[in-house]
UniProtKB/Swiss-Prot annotation:
Keywords: FAD, Flavoprotein, NADP, Oxidoreductase. It comes from Cupriavidus metallidurans (strain ATCC 43123 / DSM 2839 / NBRC 102507 / CH34). This is Ferredoxin--NADP reductase 2. The lineage of its organism: Bacteria, Pseudomonadati, Pseudomonadota, Betaproteobacteria, Burkholderiales. The keyword Transport does not apply. Homodimer. FAD binds at residues 56, 64, 69, 109, 144, 309, 350. It is an enzyme of class 1 (oxidoreductase). InterPro entries: FAD/NAD-bd_sf, FAD/NAD-binding_dom, Fd--NADP_Rdtase_type_2, Ferredoxin-NADP_redctase_2. Its EC number is 1.18.1.2. Binds 1 FAD per subunit. Coiled coil: none annotated. Belongs to the ferredoxin--NADP reductase type 2 family. One of its GO terms (molecular function) is ferredoxin-NADP+ reductase activity.
Length: 367
């Protein structure tokens, strides 16, 4: 899925031609990862008049912010007292509009080869090919997949009655809902959907949680008020009728297996992060993270940079704002590869007419 996004939406609404199996696209910068840091990397490169293409294994823009906590508040973005993951993504997309980046979604990088001319040949899992002067790895924890419910055959209901994330909460209103898991996501959605779903049953393998104590206390209070149920146990089987999931079989801590009617199952077992093909690029790794310098956030391979949660260096902090800082220095570090004969001058968006032109804004006149 290849697209350009000229407005702040995080889904694929504007198509742009790809080149699966065709001639490689010759570009200046390729960003791997369309999360907040990858999106801000587009902005910092754009200020230096470097156009970027972005690859992401997900089919939507926003990375973990949109995949894991689109509606959860974020409090530590400078000058933004509070925003959700989706709002942060939408604002970043709005911010990078002037630079018209091209997104290649739902695909992973499968091949990276250094060419004799110093550029890189890159190919994705969908056959999209590039020849690029620089690569920026902003892949967070790498590609990640939800840990799934291990019940034989139940996967056929995924996306219909079995879900690993909530895209539309109203989908579960008026339904008999089972929520499985013991972390914050499981508790948060349980509490949110009580009173909206027809019934809510929470199932966890033990009577202990990896979640905020206040959420656990609220859940137990709702159980006492008969607003929902909590059960210690594990799902071991299911029943269906005419291709529709109708019941699950839950084995409790007492060893007894009980049948439970169900319309939908929400599973929150966490995510399994994987570096995937990145681990095979010849990069220096430390505990599955990419080592970089702190001057340019360049890896051991000249021309390949790593920003955000995927990198490591002394004093590293996995914060979105740290990733933004890294993206700025990485852009300046990459400029000599793209403009070898051009001296890069430090300019400020507050005062530079050149940057105002790049951003498509008018230069203010002060009396």
């Amino acid at each position: 899925m290849d697209l350009s996004i000229p407005n702040p939406v995080a889904d694929a609404t504007h198509q742009a031609g790809g080149n699966p199996g065709g001639q490689p696209l010759e570009i200046d910068a390729l960003i791997v990862g369309a999360g907040p840091v990858g999106l801000f990397q587009v902005f910092e490169l754009g200020l230096l008049e470097i156009k970027a293409h972005i690859i992401d294994s997900l089919k939507v823009v926003g990375g973990q912010c949109v995949e894991l906590y689109p509606d959860k508040p974020i409090y530590d973005i400078p000058a933004v007292p509070i925003c959700t993951g989706q709002e942060l993504t939408d604002n970043l997309l709005k911010q990078i509009e002037p630079f018209s980046p091209t997104f290649h979604l739902g695909q992973e990088v499968s091949v990276v080869e250094r060419r004799e001319d110093g550029r890189f040949f890159v190919e994705t899992s969908l056959g999209t090919r590039f020849i690029t002067k620089t690569i920026f790895i902003a892949a967070g924890v790498g590609s990640f997949q939800p840990r799934t419910l291990k019940v034989e055959g139940i996967d056929k209901f995924e996306g219909k009655q079995l879900f690993y994330r909530v895209k539309d909460p109203s989908r579960f209103h008026g339904r008999n809902l089972v929520v499985v898991g013991g972390g914050d996501s499981a508790l948060d959605w349980t509490l949110d959907l009580v009173g909206k779903a027809e019934s809510v049953v929470m199932i966890h393998r033990r009577d202990g949680f990896r979640a905020a104590p206040a959420s656990v206390a609220k859940m137990r209070e709702l159980c006492e008020q008969m607003e929902m149920q909590f059960m210690v146990g594990q799902i071991g089987g299911y029943e269906e009728k005419d291709g529709v999931l109708t019941e699950i079989k839950v084995t409790g801590a007492d060893g007894v297996t009980r049948r439970m009617p169900v319309d939908d199952i929400l599973v929150f077992f966490g995510l399994s992060p994987k570096l995937g093909p990145i681990a095979e690029w010849g990069l220096d790794l430390e505990r599955k993270q990419i080592k970089v310098d702190t001057e340019k956030f360049e890896t051991n391979i000249p021309g390949i940079f790593a920003v955000g949660d995927i990198n490591t260096y002394p004093g590293k902090k996995k914060l979105i704002l740290s990733g933004f800082h890294e993206a700025a220095l990485a852009a300046f570090g990459a400029a000599p590869y793209i403009f070898p004969d051009k001296k890069i001058h430090m300019q400020y968006t507050t005062t530079s007419p050149k940057l105002h032109k790049v951003l498509g804004v008018e230069t203010p006149v002060f009396d």
